[in-house]
């Protein structure tokens, strides 16, 4: 279940808490892996918020044949019902319902839950309550101490025979009962027997921002993390021809000549497009925009760079830095650097301190030294989800 908004944990640039990074990996990706790694698990329905499809693709870029995406509803209870309905054609014998923000579910607990399932009873992992419990009045004053005997804190995944728990959810939906706090409560309401087994202290739910911080710290302490940071390089060159300006990084700069090319010949953006594509092993600019294709005749090169950035982001990549070096005797780049930097910021959606634009001459050597054209070298650094594989 991953359709919640996570108000208590707060929002971040990564989205709701199930998409926050812990140990360089999204919470939901880690949770999902526990189930995809379990040979006892068949089809997995991941229920997400209708607005979160792009977030999910970024968090879980790899494809799993046994994973289906389901759009959730306005409440957890309704999202669970929709997830169960998505499995109706398969009609599994049993189903496990798990919180997407419990990323530390272990294989041992999964196996014990499944081993205790029968056609006659569900299974609820839980921990015996160890804290002293108090009942308070409306004014906050203690009324009484509650005995801990027989009290348990419920965890997930909660497991049930599929048909009875789906029927229970459908009955609750039909009469608009929305007050159940978990699936075991719905099972109790419909008199489905539920067996409690010992849960795991590690199987905590990430509810607050502090929980996410602690989970991230825990993972980083448990093992060395090698984040998937990739660097791509690009190089391009264009010759001069008669004209009155050149376009560099999307900025028109007055000059006694223009650059010759099929598009607008923006040598800087062409090199940077190749650099971004290189971080995904996605070919080069000619692969995506062949110069033989007439539709790109005179095209603005920002189309190319924005296309490359989209490919990066669809794979969950975050552009950490771009660096462009222009090699030219003229025109002078310095007076236009700020405008060029801002143009790249706008195209890539990154801050100015992540953009570097430099220029150098070729000391009057070669075609650049003879003022026959301009060359550009670009480097892009992109951080992708997950770690570098061993």
UniProtKB/Swiss-Prot annotation:
Top-level division of the source organism's lineage: Bacteria
Region (2-C-methyl-D-erythritol 4-phosphate cytidylyltransferase): 1-229
Residue numbers binding a divalent metal cation: 236, 238, 270
The keyword Lipid biosynthesis is annotated on this UniProt entry: no
One Gene Ontology biological process: terpenoid biosynthetic process
Cofactor(s) annotated in UniProt: a divalent metal cation
Site, Positions MEP for the nucleophilic attack: residue positions: 148, 205
Sequence segments annotated as region (2-C-methyl-D-erythritol 2,4-cyclodiphosphate synthase): 230-390
Reaction catalysis annotation: 2-C-methyl-D-erythritol 4-phosphate + CTP + H(+) = 4-CDP-2-C-methyl-D-erythritol + diphosphate; 4-CDP-2-C-methyl-D-erythritol 2-phosphate = 2-C-methyl-D-erythritol 2,4-cyclic diphosphate + CMP
E.C. no: 2.7.7.60, 4.6.1.12
Residues where 4-CDP-2-C-methyl-D-erythritol 2-phosphate binds: 236-238, 262-263, 284-286, 360-363, 367, 370
Residues at the site labelled Transition state stabilizer: 8, 17, 262, 361
GO MF annotations, alphabetized: 2-C-methyl-D-erythritol 2,4-cyclodiphosphate synthase activity; 2-C-methyl-D-erythritol 4-phosphate cytidylyltransferase activity; metal ion binding
Pfam families, alphabetized: IspD, YgbB
Protein name as annotated: Bifunctional enzyme IspD/IspF
Biological source species: Brucella abortus (strain 2308)
UniProt gene name: ispDF
């Amino acid at each position: 279940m991953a359709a919640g908004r996570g108000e208590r944990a707060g929002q971040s640039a990564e989205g709701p808490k199930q998409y926050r990074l812990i140990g360089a990996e999204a919470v939901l990706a880690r949770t999902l892996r526990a189930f995809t790694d379990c040979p006892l698990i068949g089809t997995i329905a991941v229920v997400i918020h209708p607005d979160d499809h792009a977030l999910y693709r970024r968090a879980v870029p790899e494809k799993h044949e046994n994973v289906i995406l389901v759009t959730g509803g306005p409440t957890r209870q309704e999202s669970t019902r929709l997830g169960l309905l998505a499995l109706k054609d398969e009609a599994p014998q049993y189903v496990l319902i798990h919180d997407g923000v419990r990323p530390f579910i272990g294989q041992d607990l999964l196996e014990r839950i499944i081993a205790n399932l029968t056609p006659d009873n569900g299974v609820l992992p839980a921990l015996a309550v160890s804290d002293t419990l108090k009942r308070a009045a409306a004014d906050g004053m203690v009324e009484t101490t509650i005995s801990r005997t027989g009290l348990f804190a419920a965890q997930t995944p909660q497991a049930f025979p599929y048909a009875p728990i789906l029927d229970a959810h459908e009955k609750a939906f039909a009469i608009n009962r929305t007050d159940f706090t978990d699936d075991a409560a719905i099972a109790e309401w419909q008199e489905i027997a539920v067996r409690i087994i010992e849960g795991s202290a590690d199987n905590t739910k990430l509810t607050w921002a502090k929980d996410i911080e602690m989970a991230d710290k825990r993972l980083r302490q448990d093992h060395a993390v090698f984040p998937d940071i990739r660097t791509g390089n690009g190089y391009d060159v264009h010759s001069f021809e008669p004209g009155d300006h050149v376009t560099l990084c999307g900025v028109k700069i007055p000059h006694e000549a223009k650059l010759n090319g099929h598009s607008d010949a923006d040598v800087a953006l062409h090199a940077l497009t190749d650099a971004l594509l290189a971080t995904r092993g996605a070919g080069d600019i000619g692969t995506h925009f062949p110069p033989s294709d007439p539709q790109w005749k005179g095209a603005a090169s920002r189309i190319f760079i924005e296309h490359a950035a989209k490919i990066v982001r669809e794979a969950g990549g975050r552009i950490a830095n771009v660096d462009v070096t222009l090699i030219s005797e003229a025109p002078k780049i310095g007076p236009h650097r700020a405008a060029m930097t801002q143009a790249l910021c706008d195209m890539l959606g990154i801050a100015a301190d992540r953009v570097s634009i430099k220029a150098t001459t070729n000391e009057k050597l070669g075609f650049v030294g003879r003022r026959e054209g301009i060359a550009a070298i670009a480097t892009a650094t992109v951080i992708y989800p997950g770690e570098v594989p061993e």
